[in-house]
Swiss-Prot record:
Family of this protein: Belongs to the RemA family.
Organism of this sequence: Clostridium acetobutylicum (strain ATCC 824 / DSM 792 / JCM 1419 / IAM 19013 / LMG 5710 / NBRC 13948 / NRRL B-527 / VKM B-1787 / 2291 / W)
Lineage per the UniProt record: Bacteria, Bacillati, Bacillota, Clostridia, Eubacteriales
InterPro entries with a match to the protein in the record: RemA-like
Stretches assigned to coiled coil: none
One Pfam family matching this protein: RemA-like
Name of the protein this chain belongs to: Putative regulatory protein CA_C1717
PANTHER family to which the protein is assigned, alphabetical: REGULATORY PROTEIN SSL2874-RELATED (PTHR38449:SF1), REGULATORY PROTEIN TM_1690-RELATED (PTHR38449)
Amino acid sequence: MDIKLINIGFGNIVSANRLVAIVSPESAPIKRIIQEARDRGMLIDATYGRRTRAVIITDSDHVILSAVQPETVAHRLSTKDDGTNTVDEVEE
C-alpha cells in the first residue's frame, strides 16, 4: 500500500489519503469550523505565524491551517495522482 504525502508548506507534510477538503478560510462557515476545531482540540496550526490561506479538513475531523494557497495544495495533490512527482511518496 502506498502512503502519499503532501507538503503543505514550511516542511509540514500530511497524508493525501486522509484529505477530505482544501478550502479558503475567508467564509464565515469555515471560520466557525476553525473555532469549533480549536475548542475540541482538533486544530493543527501549520502556518508558522503567517496568514492562513488554506484550511485542510481530514477524515479524522482534524482541521489543519496552512500558509499556502488552496490551489497550490491542490496542484501538489494532483501531481501526486498523476505519478509525475514521487519525491514525498513512501512505500509501506
